[in-house]
Regions:
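Class I S-adenosyl-L-methionine
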Residues: 1-112, 117, 211, 275
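Short secondary-structure boundary/capping segments
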Residues: 23, 45, 70, 127-128, ...
Length: 275
């Protein structure tokens, strides 16, 4: 057998948000490496009964690479399960570099991000015509510094939708930097804790209430914050489905008078969406 490493995105938590390809990759594993602190144990139900299961929360990169070397020697399939999508804050590239040096075949299987899961949970689109057409994935600088130009204040100047990972442990600083970057105090926010897990908590609030909301939830880890005017915009429509818009599959139509609806941003108060 030829060794291979399968990097699998487990999604935000709920096992039924695994993709079919992810399920098949877990079922094919001789060795499963997963982080019990980040991934719900239900995903292991798809692993073979005789698979070796290793919890990566106590492992270093060197420990993981030792497993990969053993896989090469013994022709094993290792399924490395990451939370969310492996390409976003997954510490995956350092593994890929090492696997390439070892000459082991690998595959990346994408997963549902916590950003998508949180937006779905509150019933919002993150890219609204005339309001926001970009989504910034970022985090606050902590023990791991940010590159030049990627401080939170710098990115907040764009005023578009922002998804903040790994930032809930410093709520006062988070709120301050977003405000200083240019978001208005009434900018809508969503705080999502362990979204799609049985104990998920999701709360909406204004930006000037963000720090107090996070403190009230008493969350520091497993928390995503969404910020931006698109989170409470309504009354817009896309050009793509406008009668006045012609494209490859449909000509423009005469009923174009009602094609444009101005954007309206609602006021947003603190609201528990689910608990």
């Amino acid at each position: 057998m030829t060794a291979r490493i399968l990097f699998v995105g487990a999604g935000p938590g709920a096992a039924d948000l695994l993709t079919l390809r992810a399920v098949n990759a877990i079922a094919a594993a001789d060795v499963v490496i997963w982080a019990s602190s980040l991934v719900h144990e239900d995903v292991l139900e798809h692993a073979p009964a005789d698979a070796e299961v290793l919890d990566s929360k106590v492992l270093t990169l060197e420990d993981v690479l030792a497993v990969y070397r053993r896989a090469k020697e013994q022709g094993l399939t290792v399924t490395r399960i990451h939370s969310g999508d492996p390409s976003v804050y997954g510490a995956m590239q350092e593994q890929l570099d090492a696997v390439d040096e070892l000459g082991i075949a690998w595959e990346i299987i994408p997963g549902v991000t916590s950003v998508a899961a949180t937006a779905a949970a509150v019933g919002r689109e993150l890219t609204i015509p005339e309001i926001a057409q970009s989504v910034v994935f970022t985090r606050m600088a902590t023990r791991t510094p940010m590159p030049a130009g990627e401080q939170l204040r710098d990115l907040a100047r764009h005023g578009t939708t922002m998804a903040l990972f790994l930032s809930a442990a410093r709520p006062n600083r988070l709120q301050t930097e977003l405000l200083e970057g240019g978001y208005g105090p009434d900018t809508p926010c969503v705080v999502g804790y362990r979204v799609s897990w049985p104990d998920e908590r999701i709360v909406t609030c204004r930006l000037d209430e963000l720090a107090a909301t996070i403190r009230q939830l008493q969350v520091t880890m497993h928390t995503l914050v969404l910020v931006g005017p698109a989170l409470h915009a309504r009354g817009t429509r896309s050009n793509l489905y406008s009668p006045a818009f012609a494209h490859t599959y449909r000509p423009a139509r005469d009923d174009a008078a009602a094609a444009h609806v101005p954007a309206i941003a609602d006021d947003l108060g603190t609201q528990a969406v689910t608990s």
